[in-house]
Amino acid sequence: LTKAVLPHMLERGRGHIAVTSSVAGKVGVRLRTGYCAAKHAVMGFFDALRAEVEDEGIQVSTIVPGFVATAVAENSLAADGSAFGQADEDNAGGMDSDKAAAVIISGLSRGKREIPVGEGREMMALWLKRLSPELVFRMTKNRK
């Protein structure tokens, strides 16, 4: 999608790309290696793209949600392609989806480069990772 729209934005000299990553794109979580790798790739790609196009009038915002109370796990697919149909306790206890949407809209309207979305431990992990990556590693490693 970015490949399709970016040339038009560059031609106009303005635009705003918003993409969703995850707290897992900044903090590795045990038993979610593939997901974390994919979300780290999203962060890296759009950080680099931002550096390339910001002086051309293109804004790039990366939305970094933690747990948000949605049915995303229930509606996801299992490895065999069947409906997973099971709630995820972390998501169920997460930020209200309307509140999350308000945080995202506010961040986008203010042109924020990164928009953290969530409450509690995942937001604490983002903050702590900047101060003590080793501490966050030990915390996530020991989380069951």
What are these regions (language model features)?
Residues 2, 38:
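Active-site helix of classical SDR
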Residues 22:
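Residue(s) in the substrate-gating loop at a strand-loop-helix junction
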Residues 55-120:
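SDR active-site lid
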